């Protein structure tokens, strides 16, 4: 596990095109030279940008405070629910927020939550694949074996918890996860295997695997198809349909971004992975078209249009990949790859704010590299709190990025 307190090498990371003099940090470089052809000193630390951009987007969305509040005593969350009921019954417009009262408020401070922790979970699989445990396997088989080991280890915890509960769904687990992930783990615990674990799943369509796919892309920088295939292998544990298509799209976009730092190329790579006859395919093409035809005002200007034409207000959860992935691609396009524009705009779309800002941040962070992340956000978001995966508390994303960048699996030729 990666802990805070150690200094990561500033020069590690997959290489990106050289940035012209005077170009603002975070703006996409458009040098035609391929990343792998640049000298070592030109590295922009795109893996660091990817992880920190994802974490900053995760932190920027309003649900992050509720996720992080899980580290507070249960009675504080119960009181918040009671205050919400009071507001409803008494027609008051003063709405409650997560509270600390007489408890230390540290868990409620700005920082990453569940998306960043599940991204780190996948990053551990990359490091496992790069280690000696699976060194006798081929490159592709090592990654798939590491992913399978990680999921089955969690499923074993579910099985053990289920033995102490009347049914799998009510088992008390040492983790917090999306409905799709919990259902997938429950399926694994009962003996099912992918793709059944993702197909026989009430939330097969959500974007949980899309977040994981962002990290898996580092294994295939510049190879969108290979990155998408690996993301699909992982996604099948918890998703089906648009949930899988979205994972393929995000992996393809970020794999392209890691090698070219060209936002249009990255978005096109994502669209290639989205069948036109699917909801996510139709939404993504429409959203990107909106971004490209309304470029004057930047990302913030198209927020109302995306809200009215892409975001759905019918279902009880705003985590459908068919909404969040198109929003992320459109805002990255409208922001011209600038993380500091795409993430705040995504956070304005409150219904999809649980993951759309994280997806937009991952893509634009990979495009801009580690230096595109504002210093204050870097410090606030580099350390995981363990609100979803307690064993990851204290994990330093900057150090994790350096470790990922140093493995043979993340180099273009491996």
Which sequence ranges carry the predicted segments?
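Structured, active/binding-site neighborhoods that engage oxygen-rich ligands
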Residues: 1-15, 22, 26-414
């Amino acid at each position: 596990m990666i802990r805070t307190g150690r200094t990561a090498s500033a020069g590690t990371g997959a290489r990106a095109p050289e940035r012209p003099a005077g170009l603002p940090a975070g703006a996409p470089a458009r040098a035609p030279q391929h990343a792998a052809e640049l000298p070592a000193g030109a590295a922009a630390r795109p893996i660091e940008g990817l992880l920190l951009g994802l974490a900053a987007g995760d932190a920027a969305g309003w649900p992050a405070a509720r996720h992080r509040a899980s580290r507070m005593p249960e009675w504080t969350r119960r009181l918040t629910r009671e205050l919400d009921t009071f507001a409803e019954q008494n027609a008051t417009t003063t709405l409650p927020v997560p509270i600390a009262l007489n408890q230390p408020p540290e868990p409620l401070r700005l920082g990453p939550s569940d998306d960043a922790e599940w991204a780190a979970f996948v990053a551990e699989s990359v490091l496992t694949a790069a280690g000696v445990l699976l060194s006798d396997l081929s490159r592709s088989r090592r990654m798939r074996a590491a992913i399978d080991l990680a999921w089955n280890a969690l499923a074993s915890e579910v099985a053990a918890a289920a033995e102490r509960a009347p049914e799998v769904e009510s088992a008390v687990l040492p983790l917090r996860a999306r409905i799709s992930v919990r259902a997938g783990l429950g399926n694994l615990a009962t003996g099912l295997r992918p793709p059944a674990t993702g197909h026989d799943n009430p939330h097969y369509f959500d974007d949980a695997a899309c977040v994981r796919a962002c990290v898996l892309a580092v294994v295939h920088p510049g190879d969108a198809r290979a990155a998408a295939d690996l993301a699909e292998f992982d996604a099948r544990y918890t998703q089906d349909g648009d949930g899988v298509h979205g994972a393929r799209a995000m992996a393809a976009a970020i794999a392209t971004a890691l090698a070219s730092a060209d936002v249009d190329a990255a978005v096109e790579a994502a669209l290639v992975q989205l069948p036109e006859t699917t909801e996510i395919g139709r939404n993504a093409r429409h959203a990107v078209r909106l971004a490209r035809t309304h470029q004057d005002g930047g990302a913030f200007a198209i927020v109302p249009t995306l809200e009215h034409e892409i975001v759905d207000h019918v279902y009880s959860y705003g985590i459908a990949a068919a909404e969040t992935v198109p929003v992320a691609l459109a805002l990255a396009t409208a922001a011209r790859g600038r993380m500091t524009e795409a993430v705040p705009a995504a956070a304005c779309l409150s219904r999809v704010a649980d993951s759309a800002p994280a997806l937009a941040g991952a893509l634009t962070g990979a495009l801009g590299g580690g230096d595109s992340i504002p210093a204050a956000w870097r410090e606030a978001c580099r350390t995981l709190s363990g609100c979803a995966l307690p064993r990851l508390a204290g994990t330093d994303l900057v150090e994790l990025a350096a470790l990922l960048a140093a493995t043979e699996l993340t180099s273009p030729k491996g």
